[in-house]
Amino acid sequence: MIEFGNFYQLIAKNHLSHWLETLPAQIAAWQREQQHGLFKQWSNAVEFLPEITPWRLDLLHSVTAESETPLSEGQLKRIDTLLRNLMPWRKGPFSLYGVDIDTEWRSDWKWDRVLPHLSDLTGRTILDVGCGSGYHLWRMIGAGAHLAVGIDPTQLFLCQFEAVRKLLGNDQRAHLLPLGIEQLPALKAFDTVFSMGVLYHRRSPLEHLWQLKDQLVNEGELVLETLVVDGDENTVLVPGDRYAQMRNVYFIPSAPALKKWLEKCGFVDVRIADVCVTTTEEQCRTEWMVTESLADFLDPNDRSKTVEGYPAPQRAVLIARKR
């Protein structure tokens, strides 16, 4: 059973304590009413993993845990089998005592693009919206964050996160809650808020930006990463039924348009930090994610387009400050 009591105890002692007015009731309702049909199977996989304290833990350059002496073949097989019960693994990679989880996305590449543009994370309290399996939460801790909180309603991601946490010695510096941003009150408590790979899934992108702003302290930093298209500040792509085979893509602005949106929501010091085309090396099918991936979503005769004829995915990172 995945419990959240440690997180409640943690925030009861800090500036997030007012979250306890709503959070426990929301989690209790989720536990009663909203659990996925496979959640018991997934949580059992987490429960059956061994409790290991790493001899060496690297969160600065990767998410890697090592033991002082190599694990036995039987121990490795047990860990490998249980982690494979949590497939598909989309965000990573992870290297855990010799079990290497080769995820669909090279999320470490994204982190390498984002990190140089951030304010120093040392001592910061961070919120990561739509955090997936929590890979970037661990990298935030590695970069010096005091506390990294992720929210993502996808319950498989919660179990993947808890599996990794258990294999990292039950590290309590990062936490994942099975919530969406719309379920959070205006906490105004986080020094840095990340929203990476979320905005284009929102029917009202400006509302999402306001929700992110409501989580930041004054002078806090927003890190926004999302799909963009080429164009000026008035360019926005509104796909039809699908974009790169995804049904839930609503608005893809140009980077200049996105900058304008942020300014309209009251953010200041907005800058476009990075724009890059997503490659089939960064997002691809692996033995830990065996279904279709980016290569299947691009026009086989023109890789600059999706199968629907839209511009192929490119992603921008924008940094902004709450005034």
From Swiss-Prot:
Record's catalysed reaction(s): carboxy-S-adenosyl-L-methionine + 5-hydroxyuridine(34) in tRNA = 5-carboxymethoxyuridine(34) in tRNA + S-adenosyl-L-homocysteine + H(+)
Keywords from the UniProt entry: Transferase, tRNA processing
Annotated GO biological process: tRNA wobble uridine modification
Top-tier EC class: transferase
Question: Is-annotated flag, keyword Signal?
Answer: no
Q: What residues does carboxy-S-adenosyl-L-methionine bind to?
A: K91, W105, K110, G130, D152, P153, T154, I181, E182, M196, Y200, R315
What are the EC numbers? 2.5.1.-
* UniProt-recorded Gene Ontology molecular function terms: methyltransferase activity; transferase activity, transferring alkyl or aryl (other than methyl) groups
InterPro entries per record: CmoB, Mo5U34_MeTrfas-like, SAM-dependent_MTases_sf
CDD domains given in the database record = AdoMet_MTases
Asked if the record carries the keyword Protease, the reply is no
Complex and partners: Homotetramer.
Which protein family is named in the record? Belongs to the class I-like SAM-binding methyltransferase superfamily. CmoB family.
What this chain does, per the entry, is described as: Catalyzes carboxymethyl transfer from carboxy-S-adenosyl-L-methionine (Cx-SAM) to 5-hydroxyuridine (ho5U) to form 5-carboxymethoxyuridine (cmo5U) at position 34 in tRNAs.
Q: Which NCBIfam families match?
A: PRK15068.1 (NF011650), tRNA 5-methoxyuridine(34)/uridine 5-oxyacetic acid(34) synthase CmoB (TIGR00452)
Q: What is this protein called?
A: tRNA U34 carboxymethyltransferase
Q: Which species is this UniProt entry from?
A: Salmonella paratyphi A (strain AKU_12601)
Task: Write the gene name.
Answer: cmoB
